[in-house]
Amino acid sequence: MDNKIVYVVSDSVGETADLVVRAAMGQFPFAPDIRRVPYVEDTGTLKEVISIAKSNQALICFTLVKPDMRQYLVTEAAKEGVEAYDIIGPLIDQIEEITGRVPRYEPGVVRRLDEEYFKKIEAIEFAVKYDDGRDARGILKADIVLIGISRTSKTPLSQYLAHNKRLKVANVPLVPEVDPPEELYQVAKEKCFGLKITPEKLNHIRKERLKSLGLSDGATYANINRIKEEIDHFENVVSKINCQVIDVSNKAIEETANIIVNAVQNQKMF
């Protein structure tokens, strides 16, 4: 058995079957020769694998989600005296019986879910790394660039788009005393979105923010004239970029996110 060959057959990459076989074989004091046969889509390939397995006195372990392919392999392998073990089929059948739901029978579902998960994590990490203008290099790497003055929901919107839409978002705060990074004028205007808010709304938000920090709401940060100065600066920058501006004064994060997603989909950017 030390030199026993095991053919791992799958209609996808075969990682699931490979891991299960290795886990099972790990319980024995020998290391078999595991050979993966991925992306099997036709009975011709199965017939060939059965023939090779027979000549090598090998075991076949498989994850095939389509019933006809599973049945073909089991039947033909039995005819040739080849042991074939169905790793996932019995479990799919049992779940169908218990739930009364019909399986999708789609190969590679787990891998697609994994890819989506890691894409989300990557987007979240990107949003954190390039939050609040920390690194201007992120502007040119981003799927979306948000610009606006303080307290216009840039950070929560960036996180929402990362979590729910898997978009890499950089956000840049605009302050009259600081020139915007040059990268902001180099990025495609279709990727850039300005977040606008009314002076009165922002005045209220900033006063509440100061109160929550135990500070006086009479600080310059919440002064209406200062706010208007910042908004004028914002208007000047977005006019130069010529990007889309969204009024977030009375919008929930989800609403603003949907506007952005619809805009980029209409432009077929992704």
From Swiss-Prot:
Catalysed reactions listed for this entry: N(tele)-phospho-L-histidyl/L-threonyl-[pyruvate, phosphate dikinase] + ADP = N(tele)-phospho-L-histidyl/O-phospho-L-threonyl-[pyruvate, phosphate dikinase] + AMP + H(+); N(tele)-phospho-L-histidyl/O-phospho-L-threonyl-[pyruvate, phosphate dikinase] + phosphate + H(+) = N(tele)-phospho-L-histidyl/L-threonyl-[pyruvate, phosphate dikinase] + diphosphate
Keyword line: Kinase, Nucleotide-binding, Serine/threonine-protein kinase, Transferase
Position of the signal peptide: none
Enzyme Commission number: 2.7.11.32, 2.7.4.27
UniProt binding sites for ADP: 148-155
UniProt superkingdom: Bacteria
One protein family per Pfam: Kinase-PPPase
GO molecular function: ADP binding; ATP binding; phosphotransferase activity, phosphate group as acceptor; protein serine/threonine kinase activity
Role according to the record: Bifunctional serine/threonine kinase and phosphorylase involved in the regulation of the pyruvate, phosphate dikinase (PPDK) by catalyzing its phosphorylation/dephosphorylation.
Record-stated family: Belongs to the pyruvate, phosphate/water dikinase regulatory protein family. PDRP subfamily.
Record's protein name: Putative pyruvate, phosphate dikinase regulatory protein
Species the sequence originates in: Bacillus cereus (strain 03BB102)
Lineage of the organism: Bacteria, Bacillati, Bacillota, Bacilli, Bacillales
